[in-house]
Amino acid sequence: AASGDPRPGPVHLNISWRDPLSPVHVPDSVTAESVFALEGRGDEPLNRVLNGTPWVSSATLEEITRRIDAAERIMVVAGRQRSQTLAEPLSRIAARCGAPVIAEPTSQMRYGSHDRSGVVTTYDHIATEQPAGLAPDLVIRFGEMPTSKPLRIWLSSLGDLEQIVVDPLFTFNEPTRTAGLI
């Protein structure tokens, strides 16, 4: 609230520890005692924020376009959106990229007058199975990360996956710690 965030509330740190209710130790997992718990990726920062303004610069658009052109299998992930106004442009972006839209129930993408032909609502089943043939090499996420644990696990398991996060509220909600561009 004091920082001027449009969503008032307590401060929250998204630090991915092990599943807190699971009594099973996960080998090689990051723990509170691990020196790597808050580290980035080697000499690189964990995330790179290209633009801290509510508009997109031409340099940022060129960077995103270059990454989209280089990708073979793109997936658009639609997290929580406050307004239905983004549904139409988001569906056009996905159609232009030939990408499915993984739609969180609060994404405003499941209903409305926009093109919903590429909207996937039952993505938990796909994410649980983790089929190699459907694994994306680029994810473009709009809004918050969906609440689906299988989706987060699947995206986290894809080591070479490139993720771009478009977050107009600047919440930087990235629980998978895998997005390279915000």
Model-predicted segments: where are they?
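Short, intrinsically disordered, charge-balanced linker/junction segments flanking boundaries
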Residues: 1, 180-182
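Glycine-rich, anion-gripping cofactor-binding loops and their flanking helix/strand elements
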Residues: 60, 78-168, 172-175
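Active-site donor-nucleotide binding/catalytic segment of nucleotide-sugar enzymes
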Residues: 65-84
